[in-house]
Amino acid sequence: MKKLAFIYFLALSVFCTATAQKHYTVVISLDGYRWDYTEWYDTPFMDMMADKGVKSALIPSYPSKTFPNHYSIVTGLYPDHHGIVANSFLDRTTGESFSLGNPEQKINPVYYGGEPVWVTAQKQGLSTAVFYWPGSDVRIGGQYPNTYYMYDRKPRLTIEERLNGVIGQLSLPESQRPDLIMAYYEQPDSYGHEYGPFSKKTRSVIGHIDSLLTDFHAKLVKLPIADRVNLIVLADHGMSWVGAGNSVKIASRLRPEWIEKIDGNLPANIYCRDGFADSVVNALQGLDHARVWKKENVPARLNYGTNQRVGEVIVDPDLGYIIDERDLPGGGMHGFDPACLDMHALFRAMGPDFKHVEIPHFRNVDIYPLLCRLLGIKPADNDGCVEEIAEILK
């Protein structure tokens, strides 16, 4: 009897140990991968993920631009709250202009509010590795990811090298293996811009990405820990066609003495000199194909306008138009209202903690608390709510 009891408790111990094995989280971002590319193009890998795991799409934060949204994904904060309010902006406090084209400014932590998930994880004893995710080469909260790469240090790793790097990190001994691994890839965004979302070139790059991920997954499933890896593939925003000549021109309506700076085109942030915001708004009344707001009057659903880095006046173009003084050729663009389906982005997930389910499109600020739930860590303050998507979790 004692022998049987011993065997029972030994088996129970082994079972509990096995079930308590830690899970790992891998997040891959494909810049500008519109949510319905999987319906327009042949994407067997994405289809496989949908068949085995979670199929949905992400609603971007406003404005639906790359840098603000990648940082929203990892902090759970809207751009207005984390401070990267656009790809370029004027900081009223410092008087400096932030631009992705200025490497020194881009890695200055003063611009980055909130707490990225790699910092949250490391503060709670976990390890992280991040391949080129926007903001990962910035010392935020006094920390970098445990493993990271400087984006402006060239040559950059190719997408094949990044994906192989993920496999390499997962292949490390358990004591060295990161709990969270994230990787960013610039495509299909640039093809979408140059050729539009529905073109042979975009079809080609979507097929190439799918093939690379198929190869990546084939390597992943051969790892001893394959059944302990949660894989998420997502994007920051979608893409929409802007026809040739669809430029909304505003400069001729404005007096130079009213304006300190105009930044961006989707939307345009107008930084006004003291006392001239009303003059700018009045001058732009009746503008075709765009809405004009003082920052305090931006619709609440956009969660935008309270940050001092947002211009005093925002000009928000209709879908299919852009704020520009030039007559531009047609091309793909993003930055539009997140309510536009064209702006919605890919989301797929599969692994030991995910159900097989399809859910409605959800906010990208919910990703940060989701990652914290997967990692078993306490999130920092954020605008997301993992309970809104709890049905995707086992």
Predicted stretch roles:
Residues 27, 45, 208-250:
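Metal-dependent active-site segment of extracytoplasmic phospho-/sulfohydrolases and closely related
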